[in-house]
């Protein structure tokens, strides 16, 4: 079957990843020890997309966990589903990357990378027909960004024809964890443009806003944010794991969403998002899902789709519904908001329908869009990068690890090329 190999790196990646496995285990009826306790054959039919069946009948995630310090790994291991992972698949160093991209990419990370690649190879050999890799990481720190992109480029060398999907958490506009985020993010984007096939762009601030405004949580925790991300991650691959009327997979998604190879950074959203108190007062209908799914407030990254235009988009519906209704709603959206879609790609919204809804919902939908407005985010990071780089602030941390200023200049111009790539997209006869 079409297996997906999951890799999580750094603190952020491991926290998102462990939440994701909680969601997927729940959907497939697998308990924290790896035993199947579900009630429907559909849960087992394609369970091997994400799981390996061990000899004793236990299901083991096809997951590789890496970090440059043991802390987060220990908390994953002691967490609710910590015992389900294969112990050999935890690969960690002791030193940490200290939020330094160069440490993750060139020094500390480079020492650990072969151990990670061995585990990846072992997992890939266990697959019948590996479809691709999904990587969870953040771009603001050191390990997820530096070592994450190093791993992506190594996997790209070894498996050039497999899909590479990333869930990348970008630095937020107002909330900054570390002062060198713009450096780390720019150096990472430089790599992702070249080596990844599809990047789902996430950002903590947008996720905070969704939790605060829509879900009415007064003090959202990272756990709440990661829950949103994992719902989306599960939605992107649900068609591979459950039978559906209209299937999509990672490659179909890429073919339908990427008109130009470099422009593969997508905005994602999920519906229905309702606060816990108001759930019972809302009917779940396809029009309602569609409306929320296309709502700008629902996007999980800090860019406003109303400031740009959609090149392409994909809507993945889950639950019992008529495909005709789903298609009609999509056509409806395009007709009503035609100025927000480029007119030189006709029918640029792809929809797919999977019969099994997420736990506790009768229907749901996941949105993935390729919008030119995502340049706002790259522009913002780029401006912060330039402000510091002009003064050569904090550079010694990177050059001390053997990096060259030239590399910063290259990354900066690659980011600017990406932004102008989005800006040059012709609008409506202007």
Swiss-Prot record:
Protein name: Tubulin beta-3 chain
Family of this protein: Belongs to the tubulin family.
PANTHER family reported for this sequence: TUBULIN (PTHR11588)
GO annotation, biological process: microtubule cytoskeleton organization; mitotic cell cycle; response to brassinosteroid; seed trichome elongation
Co-factor requirement: Mg(2+)
Record's signal peptide: none
Keyword Nucleotide-binding set for record: yes
The keyword Repeat is assigned to this record: no
Any coiled-coil regions, as ranges: none
Recorded GO CC terms: cytoplasm; microtubule
Listed Pfam families: Tubulin, Tubulin_C
Localization, UniProt: Cytoplasm, Cytoskeleton
Binding site for GTP: 11, 69, 138, 142-144, 204, 226
This protein's UniProt keywords: Cytoplasm, Cytoskeleton, GTP-binding, Magnesium, Metal-binding, Microtubule, Nucleotide-binding
Subunit structure: Dimer of alpha and beta chains. A typical microtubule is a hollow water-filled tube with an outer diameter of 25 nm and an inner diameter of 15 nM. Alpha-beta heterodimers associate head-to-tail to form protofilaments running lengthwise along the microtubule wall with the beta-tubulin subunit facing the microtubule plus end conferring a structural polarity. Microtubules usually have 13 protofilaments but different protofilament numbers can be found in some organisms and specialized cells.
Annotated Gene3D superfamilies: Helix hairpin bin (1.10.287.600), Tubulin/FtsZ, C-terminal domain (3.30.1330.20), Tubulin/FtsZ, GTPase domain (3.40.50.1440)
Binding locations of Mg(2+): 69
SMART domains for this protein: Tubulin, Tubulin_C
InterPro entries the UniProt entry points to: Beta-tubulin_BS, Beta_tubulin, Tub_FtsZ_C, Tubulin, Tubulin/FtsZ-like_C, Tubulin/FtsZ_2-layer-sand-dom, Tubulin/FtsZ_GTPase_sf, Tubulin_C
GO molecular function terms attached to this record: GTP binding; GTPase activity; metal ion binding; structural constituent of cytoskeleton
Source organism of the structure: Gossypium hirsutum
Function: Tubulin is the major constituent of microtubules, a cylinder consisting of laterally associated linear protofilaments composed of alpha- and beta-tubulin heterodimers. Microtubules grow by the addition of GTP-tubulin dimers to the microtubule end, where a stabilizing cap forms. Below the cap, tubulin dimers are in GDP-bound state, owing to GTPase activity of alpha-tubulin.
